[in-house]
Amino acid sequence: MRRTRSAKTTLVGGVMTGGTHPIDFTAAPSQGRSLDVRWIHGSESAKHNTDPDIQVHAYDAHTLILRQNMAVHCEAPFLFLLFGNDRAVLLDTGATAAAEFFPLRRTVDDLVGRWLAAHPRDRYELLVLHTHAHGDHVAGDGQFAGRPDTVVVGADRATAWAYLGLGADLDRVTTLDLGGRVLECLASPGHHEAAVTFYDAFTGFLFTGDTVYPGRLYVQDWAAFRDTIDRLVRFTETRAVSHVLGCHIEMTTTPGVDYPIRTTYQPDEPPLQMSPRRLRDVRAAIDEVDGRTGRHPYADFVICWEP
């Protein structure tokens, strides 16, 4: 049993600064900044872990990356909080429902409050969306129940895709306007039927959820997964992508070697960020695997296909 610690967060990286005028997210894109971050990665004894429940990294004044403590939940997912002029969007809500152990609502309220102190608004909305509907990405949804000016969109395919304007035409790319900061949304089934990829032109980030990340790529639908990777490769050929960001790290820095499932200590992690080349590497691996079931390790990821 892990000991209970007082809820705390750590903010590293950029400092939130600004004024009261609308931010022009097109005039000065925030691409090309460093993501050389030492992420919290658990400890040999989860009971004695002293890391914050949530680590927060400010990539810039309007873009925050959160990681859940591995001692709280072994999945240690990454979450993303993006600010626009009219509203912020939180992508995913982590793997733990209880605010006592995973104070996501409190953390987000604090971060939104800091942003609004620097950029006052009469009214400001929080939108909660998901990369897909697996439990380690939606568990914290309930913490936002009753929060004023907040919309939590269900993560199931029917609800999420309808909200984003996605549907039967999987090649269709839709947009989500946060107030001058526009995200592009792509249906991305394969790992999960409801998966969505988001692209933020301001940072150049492509948020791929569990479709592509430095770890075990679990495939639910082989044909859909292949087609999704094809679409993502084509998409990145016409966009300025600075980093591809998934929601987990499961590999070690030794090529082809991943950490054991349910580990709570990963001291030798590779970076979270990937280049668009990783998408092409995954696509080449799909051709090599050719639908064969089982576990197929590659240097930077493992394809896991068990229909």
Residue ranges and their predicted role:
Residues 48, 72-75, 189-191:
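A short catalytic or substrate-binding loop motif that flags glycine-/basic-rich loops and adjacent residues
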Residues 153-169, 195, 215, 267-291:
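Active-site-proximal loop/helix segment associated with metal-binding centers of metalloenzymes
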